[in-house]
A protein has these predicted regions:
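ATP-binding/phosphotransfer module of carbohydrate and carboxylate kinases, centering on a glycine-rich
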Residues: 3-7, 12-153
């Protein structure tokens, strides 16, 4: 995603995960708090232990810095979604994981930036959905799908 970006646990740099996961949101918060002077409820917390839940809680009560963190995260993920839509034309993209609990705080910026970065021909055609599956169910269904795929081969 980002050339010379953040180091990822996989050993590469700039992976989408480092910006748009729960850990990525917490990392963005720590970066913003280090380089900026904006007032924020997040400043009341230990910078080394800030979580995405802390950012969500602050954003939920209108904290401008926390809202900007979700906007920035949504912009990065929205741009990536636009790229994905351009080469694959899916009917929908289904989001999954703990960060989706942020709801519209995350999904609205994703939707806005995806649409903004799409060619006109693709705009308004791809649904962005949040999975209702439990994490344990998703793992089982994913493993099952691999079995179905192998059987078809």
């Amino acid at each position: 995603v980002r050339r010379n970006g953040r180091m990822c646990g996989c050993g590469r740099q700039g992976c989408l995960e480092t910006y748009t996961s729960a850990t990525g949101v917490a990392r963005t918060a720590r970066e913003y708090l280090t380089i900026r002077t904006d007032e924020s409820k997040l400043r009341e917390l230990d910078i080394d232990t800030i979580t995405s839940k802390d950012v969500f809680d602050a954003a939920s009560v209108g904290d401008a810095l926390a809202l900007e963190i979700f906007e920035s995260t949504g912009a990065i993920l929205g741009e990536a979604c636009a790229d994905f839509v351009t080469f694959s034309s899916p009917e929908a993209i289904i989001f999954f994981g703990g960060l989706t609990k942020a709801g519209d705080l995350l999904m609205n910026p994703i939707r806005h930036h995806m649409e903004k970065n799409l060619l006109k021909i693709y705009q308004g055609k791809t649904k962005l959905l949040v999975s209702q599956l439990k994490e344990s169910d998703a793992a089982v269904l994913g493993a099952s799908a691999l079995g179905w795929e192998a059987k078809e081969i």
